[in-house]
Amino acid sequence: MATSSLTKPQMRWPSGPRRLRFHIVGAFIVSLGVATFYKFAVAEPRKKAYADFYRNYDSMKDFEEMRKAGIFQSAK
């Protein structure tokens, strides 16, 4: 039996691979931009806010305020 190799189907657009490469590169660039924006617009300010809060945080003071307010039943 003689076997013949099948031919690959022709792409729909003549510029198909080039267009696909353009969109993949574009999507990669956009995703890097969004990740960078999120890091500097959301994550860094949040990290700074947490650091500022815990720099001056006194857990014993908060505990005493909650105890005086009557939140805890076991610590009177």
Curated annotation (Swiss-Prot):
It is a single-pass membrane protein. This is Cytochrome c oxidase subunit 6C. GO terms for cellular component: mitochondrial inner membrane. It is found in: Mitochondrion inner membrane. Pathway: Energy metabolism; oxidative phosphorylation. Belongs to the cytochrome c oxidase subunit 6c family. It comes from Sus scrofa (Pig). Component of the cytochrome c oxidase, the last enzyme in the mitochondrial electron transport chain which drives oxidative phosphorylation. The respiratory chain contains 3 multisubunit complexes succinate dehydrogenase (complex II, CII), ubiquinol-cytochrome c oxidoreductase (cytochrome b-c1 complex, complex III, CIII) and cytochrome c oxidase (complex IV, CIV), that cooperate to transfer electrons derived from NADH and succinate to molecular oxygen, creating an electrochemical gradient over the inner membrane that drives transmembrane transport and the ATP synthase. The chain crosses the membrane at residues 14-55. CDD domains: CcO_VIc. Pfam families: COX6C. Residues 56-76 are mitochondrial intermembrane. One of its GO terms (biological process) is oxidative phosphorylation. Residues 1-13 are mitochondrial matrix. Gene3D superfamilies: Mitochondrial cytochrome c oxidase subunit VIc/VIIs.
